Amino acid sequence: MDRLAARKNELAIVHQTGERDYNAVRTAYARREINAEVVPFLTNMPERFAWADIIVCRAGAITAAEIAAAGRAAIFIPFGRATDSHQLRNAQEMFRAGAGRLISEAELTPEKLTSEIFSLLDQPQDIEKLSTAARELARPHAARDIVNLIEEAANVQANRQRATA
């Protein structure tokens, strides 16, 4: 947090903590005089994502899809005990596509995280590359496309049944 404090005037931080860690995190920022909006839970994620230049987050499927839909640069920290390592796999896919950075829980230290954050802030073109790659992964019409595929399959099946009748 000391590196954050040194550059605190360059940053606008929103930190979702969950109920359990709220007081400790809020106190840590206050102790270093870092102005951060610390909240147990965020609402209106599309608005929050649109506001952010960099999102530091877990790597659940919904989060990865929201990052892609928002077209935002992300640093993924997959939950290490997620079932079948699905968060790690999601983060690896985003990383391979150039749509995010990846720090495993085993590698996570305050220094590593702040290094990744400032690496991006110091190279705005890297933020843009990650954002563009994330946006390219977005499937905003996925529900419609799935419905179309189901209808297409149903029509093929109905046509086969008519042909054999």
Q: Where are the model-predicted features located?
A:
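A short, well-ordered alpha-helix in the C-terminal region of glycosyltransferases
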Residues: 126-140
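C-terminal alpha-helical cap of glycosyltransferases
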Residues: 139-165
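A donor-sugar binding/catalytic signature common to diverse glycosyltransferases
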Residues: 45-87
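Short, small-residue-enriched loops and turns at beta-alpha junctions
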Residues: 15, 81-84, 110, 137
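Two-component system phosphotransfer/interaction surface
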Residues: 109-122, 147, 151
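A ubiquitous structural signal for well-ordered alpha-helices
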Residues: 3, 116, 130-133, 149
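Donor-nucleotide binding loops and adjacent catalytic segments primarily
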Residues: 1-55, 88-92, 96, 103-113
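Catalytic machinery of carbohydrate-active enzymes
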Residues: 115-118, 126, 143, 159
